[in-house]
Amino acid sequence: MKVCNLSSGSDGNATYIEGTHAKILVDAGLSCKELERRLALLNVAPEEIDAILITHEHTDHIKGLDVFVNRYRPLVFVHKDGLNALRKKLKKPLVISTFDDEPFLIEDLKILPIPVPHDVDRCTGYVISENEKKDKYFHRFGVHY
């Protein structure tokens, strides 16, 4: 599994994660243009992104979401308890998939959602692992453990 922090902090949060069969982003807190530029530095075309996992609805986590999704059509996932807050922040309507607290798969990546305290209705951290490999990555809005 390959993990690359594209940006972390109040100016924007986005992390690229690549498994054998899946390429995802955790958050899209940069402009679409900046997401494209930073993905290009990794030799990743934006249309290769399969999905975007959203931690929560603050602008520094979703700034480029509308434009990126309308342009490249990745799936978008957010915890069911954060859906309404996310929809209120978006400029354009998007198709958004929800999940609960159970693990789910995006291709070969196993996603384990974990509630994280923050000043929002629902903030979700993710433990991401590739199949049954031992490599795991925990993402909590810009802080990696």
Describe these PLM feature segments.
Residues 1, 22, 74, 93-94, ...:
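A structural micro-motif
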Residues 32-78:
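Active-site metal-binding motif and surrounding structural segment of the metallo-beta-lactamase
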Residues 4-6, 11-14, 56-61, 87, ...:
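Structured catalytic core of nucleotide-sugar glycosyltransferases
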Residues 78-133:
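Metallo-beta-lactamase
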Residues 7-8, 28-30, 57, 81, ...:
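Active-site metal-binding loops of divalent metal-dependent hydrolases
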Residues 12, 34, 60-63, 120-123, ...:
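Residues that form or flank phosphate/diphosphate-binding pockets in enzymes
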Residues 26, 54, 112-114:
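Redox-cofactor binding/interface segments in oxidoreductases and associated redox assembly factors
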Residues 1-42, 124-140:
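Conserved beta-strand hairpin/beta-sheet module of binuclear metal-dependent hydrolase folds
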